[in-house]
A protein has these predicted regions:
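P-loop NTPase motor module signature
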Residues: 1-472, 534-548, 795-797, 804
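Long, charged, glycine-rich C-terminal linkers/tails
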Residues: 106-112, 562, 581, 787-789
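Short conserved micro-motifs at the rims of enzyme active sites and ligand-binding pockets
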Residues: 137-138, 229-230, 347, 392-395, ...
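Conserved helicase core region in the C-terminal RecA-like lobe
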Residues: 130-131, 317-322, 339, 565-566, ...
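Short, surface-exposed, low-complexity cationic segments
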Residues: 596-618, 794-832, 837-839, 843
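Generic recognition of stable, solvent-exposed alpha-helical segments in well-folded globular domains
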Residues: 33, 56, 60, 87, ...
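Acidic, serine/threonine- and proline-rich low-complexity intrinsically disordered segments
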Residues: 2-5, 483-582, 587, 603-779, ...
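Amphipathic alpha-helical packing elements
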Residues: 582-586, 590-593, 693-700, 772-800, ...
């Protein structure tokens, strides 16, 4: 039987003509293997399809499944196909409907956010992953759907990963549901193992591999002279290099084949617009430059991905990763690759998430290159060198590993798998990121303490936006009106870029209808208004709303207020005294504004998006505000009452405890008033200062330091009962020796009035304390009669009890610095602590300069003294330098005064 031509059957459903649809498509040769793999599993089944981009899998597999399902159930089939992007879903549906010869929206249709062309007779429906996720939450059994195809699973989008796990569970309840995962890269075995867990006793799902359809592909390396990235992001010099390389390569290609179109890959919308603008000023007359990214309108997107007739105007299509794998752009024989891509990143420490520019993976680079050789020989020009390619990761980072998981956590809670527990996901979500996401949901009231979903959580999950925005839609509808709340949420949830980060200007543009996204925005607003109308009365926080109802929020202030309701941790106030506008957020994060932003004149902002960057716009903060709306101080406080606190803050500074009454909104100090601290507040301030600065916050007087050194030597040599007076030991037993002084400071006494010598004596053991002066005297009487101060060793932290290892002349011994002449006749070195510790003598010249260091006076007199005498007697003739120091009179005087 010819698999491309379905058998005639006596039913009303007209099947797809696969022979017509598959004409010229490489994957047509693999339909037999796919059919056999599915039929071998009976009703339903799971299969993984592995085929490079451009082979026709997205065009052929859906109608094949529709035919097989229709044949099996003798009725109209329904096959749902996910595409990672809206433009890809529309393009795939349009192409299949065209090949089928049917009207788009009848047998073949699509549904994306804000737009649907499908009906009851639709057999193949292309949708974005988010659409299917929300359908699953409403209808976990997917009644009326016989097959699901997850396309481009290799991209590892967060929503697609969730669908892999959730649909595997659906198949455990619905054995008749056919599930196919399609990948463009060599990672099929991973998904085969996951999807096979729920089928055939856990055996991997069969893999249908389609060989590459590449024609000859020339790879050219044209690296830029400088770096691709600088502290502002993608370097302008590199963008200029990409533009110049594109013009040169396309002109060269047109000389050989006038029908060659070029496809240029850049990481983001800004770079696409920049390079497209440069190209328009440099290309030959008659060459059209088109942009392809998520912020242009659907018509412009569709025009860019549509082919052209031979002889029509040659095109250069400048695209984000949108055209990497989920779209085939007809006519492309030349690819210019920047080698860069954007990936989500989450900064838990600063409460930020966003996109960062990184080198694309090897898999992405190969897919981009392959776009040039799908329909004939092609060429890829890589604007980087082979070393950079070799250093690139093999695959792009799974989004679940690096993205904000708040929306995903809500989906999982609604599914009955809080935190993803028990769900067979390609990669488990990071524990810390998931815990943070669940905590956000708890604060919203979307989940319980245990993590199970609440009624409010199920309502928030219906809104196609971040749960925080969904909650702001419901609360904001009551406070500012459904229309204004819906407009703000639709704008922030969309992917339109706010020039200068100014959301109010962007809102005015989409309202006017002149913006490319105006039509989709209007649809989103309409849908969100409807959701707000249905759900507000049952789910709003009445107590909170009643406290805010008295606010007079103007239409101009409404966007900022709604954003602040959604993201109270991102309410920001300008930091005074900064040349470049810098804002402090309630979360404690600092961020800059894009240069020239009209928002710079506002003291308060409600920030919808803030991301990491090291560019000029960050103003040295490491972050930049990407979208925000003005806010007043009053509305800021009203939007985040849970962050508003009045607190007395006491601190120990400049030697005493001071306090002030602070009124704060998160990290933002609204007002400060000096107050008298309570005793408890003072104690806390003193304890905090001690924890940070130790006893140096009080200071050691000379007397206290000397006593502490003597006590430390006793502890080192004798141990208990002599106390350990190291810093850590003293801090550990403050109540035993310093409690009265600490209480005095806590109630306002300055530290300068406290001498630690007397408190230290409280630690001396009794009756041993009476022997302190004899064991470790303050002074030592020398033969001249002088009483010379003994310099005891500095106290080391954690001295640890008896230890004789630190007795060398390196700072571990007690030292007496005395003039040499005062020690004549001293034949034995004095020892302290009952003879345990020798005194180290620093013998000085008459001018007080060191002549010798010794712990053995007898050896010094017998040896080195004669050399010292020979050198010094001429320099100091007025002082005695006897030949026999043993019998000479010790003196502190000159010879004339003796």
């Amino acid at each position: 039987m010819d698999l491309l031509v379905p058998p005639s059957r006596d039913n009303s459903v007209v099947t797809f003509r696969l022979d017509t649809i598959g004409a010229g498509l490489v994957f047509a040769d693999s339909l037999g293997k796919l059919t056999a793999a599915l039929k071998s599993q009976g009703d339903g089944g799971t299969v993984v399809v592995q085929a490079p981009p451009g082979t026709g899998k997205t065009t052929l597999v859906p109608p094949l499944l529709a035919n097989l399902v229709g044949e099996r159930r003798r009725g109209q089939p329904r096959v749902v196909v996910t595409q990672p992007r809206r433009v890809a879903a529309r393009s795939a549906a349009r192409r299949l409907a065209s090949l089928d010869g049917s009207r788009l929206g009848s047998r073949v249709g699509y549904t994306v956010r804000g737009e649907s062309k499908s009906g009851s007779d639709t057999m193949v429906e292309f949708v974005t992953p988010g659409i299917l996720l929300r359908r699953l939450l409403v209808d976990p059994g997917l009644e009326g759907t016989q097959a699901v195809i997850l396309d481009e699973v290799h991209e590892r989008g967060l929503e697609t990963d969730l669908l892999v796990g959730m649909l595997a569970e659906v198949r455990e309840l619905r054995g008749d549901l056919t599930l196919v995962a399609m990948s463009a890269t060599l990672d099929a075995a991973r998904f085969a193992a996951l999807l096979g867990r729920s089928a055939d006793g856990g055996a991997p799902a069969p893999v249908v591999d389609c060989p590459s359809a590449l024609h000859a592909l020339e790879v050219q390396w044209v690296p830029a002279a400088g770096q691709r990235l600088d502290d502002r992001g993608v370097a302008y010099s590199f963008l200029n290099h990409v533009a110049e390389t594109t013009v040169a390569a396309h002109e060269e290609a047109l000389m050989v084949n006038p029908d060659v179109d070029a496809l240029v890959f850049l990481p983001g919308v800004r770079e696409v617009s920049d390079v497209a603008s440069r190209l328009r000023g440099r290309v030959q007359a008659g060459v059209e430059v088109l942009e392809l990214h998520g912020q242009i309108g659907p018509d412009a997107q569709d025009r860019a991905v549509s082919g052209r007739e031979p002889g029509d105007t040659p095109r250069i299509i400048v695209s984000t990763a949108l055209a990497e794998s989920s779209l085939t752009v007809p006519g492309v024989r030349l690819v210019i690759d920047s080698g860069l891509s954007r990936e989500p990143r989450r900064d838990a420490g600063r409460g930020m998430s966003g996109l960062v520019t990184v080198s694309c993976s090897k898999a992405s680079a190969e897919q981009r290159a392959g776009r040039a050789a799908r329909q004939g020989p092609g060429r890829v020009v890589r604007c980087y060198d082979q070393q950079a390619f070799a250093a690139a990761p093999a695959h792009q980072t799974p989004e679940i590993s690096v993205a904000d998981l708040t929306s995903a956590a809500l989906v999982l809670a609604c599914w009955g798998a809080p935190g993803g527990r028990g769900l067979a996901l390609p990669d488990a979500p990071p524990r810390a990121a998931m815990d943070d996401a669940v905590e956000v949901l708890r604060e919203l009231g979307a989940v319980t303490v245990e993590g199970t979903v609440t009624d409010l959580g199920r309502t928030l999950a219906k809104v196609p936006a971040d749960p925080r925005l969904a909650r702001a839609l419901l609360d904001g509808s009551t406070l500012v009106g459904r229309r204004l709340a819906a407009e703000t949420v639709a704008l922030v949830a969309g992917d339109q870029r706010a020039v200068g980060a100014d959301l109010t200007k962007l809102l005015a543009a989409v309202r006017s209808g002149s913006h490319p996204a105006a039509r989709r925005f209007a649809e989103d607003v309409k849908r969100m208004e409807s959701l707000a109308r249905q759900e507000t009365s049952n789910t709003v926080d009445r107590q909170r709303i009643d406290s805010q109802r008295a606010l007079d929020v103007s239409a101009r202030e409404a966007p900022g207020f709604v954003v602040a309701l959604a993201f109270p941790d991102r309410i920001a106030r300008r930091v005074p005294g900064q040349g470049t506008p810098t804002y402090l957020l309630t979360s404690g994060t600092r961020a800059g504004l894009p240069a020239g932003s009209a928002l710079a004149g506002h003291d308060w902002l409600a920030v919808a998006e803030v991301s990491r960057t090291q560019g000029r716009d960050a103003a040295g903060t490491g972050a930049v505000i990407r979208s925000a709306a003005p806010l007043s101080a009053e509305l800021a406080a009203a939007a985040a009452p849970e962050l508003l606190v009045e607190e007395v803050t006491a601190r120990f500074a400049q030697g005493r405890v001071t306090a002030r009454l602070e009124r704060r909104l998160g990290a933002l100090v609204l007002s400060m008033t000096p107050v008298r601290p309570s005793a408890e507040q003072g104690r806390h301030a003193v304890a905090t200062a001690l924890e940070k600065a130790g006893l140096s916050m009080i200071g050691w007087s000379a007397a206290a330091d000397a006593l502490r050194r003597r006590m430390a030597l006793l502890y080192r040599e004798l141990g208990d009962p002599w106390p350990d007076v190291s810093e850590s030991a003293l801090l550990a037993r403050l109540d035993d020796w310093l409690a009265p002084e600490l209480e005095s400071m806590a109630t306002g006494a300055p530290a300068t009035t406290i001498d630690l010598a007397d408190p230290l004596r409280r630690l001396l053991p009794w009756p041993e304390a009476s022997a302190l002066d004899s064991l470790v005297p303050e002074r030592l009487q020398v033969p001249s009669g002088s009483r010379v101060r003994i310099e005891y060793p500095e106290v080391s932290d954690g001295s640890g009890g008896p230890d004789r290892t630190n007795m060398e002349p390196d700072g571990g011994s007690p030292v007496v610095a005395v003039k040499l002449q005062e020690c004549f006749g001293w034949d034995r070195t004095p020892r302290l602590i009952e003879g345990r510790v020798p005194v180290l003598f620093h013998l000085l010249s008459p001018a007080g300069r060191p002549l010798a260091v010794t712990a053995d006076l007898a050896s010094f007199w017998s040896g080195p003294y004669s050399q010292v005498r020979a050198e010094m007697r001429g320099r100091y003739p007025k002082h005695p330098w006897p030949e026999d120091p043993w019998t000479a009179l010790a003196t502190s005087k000159t010879k004339n005064r003796m």
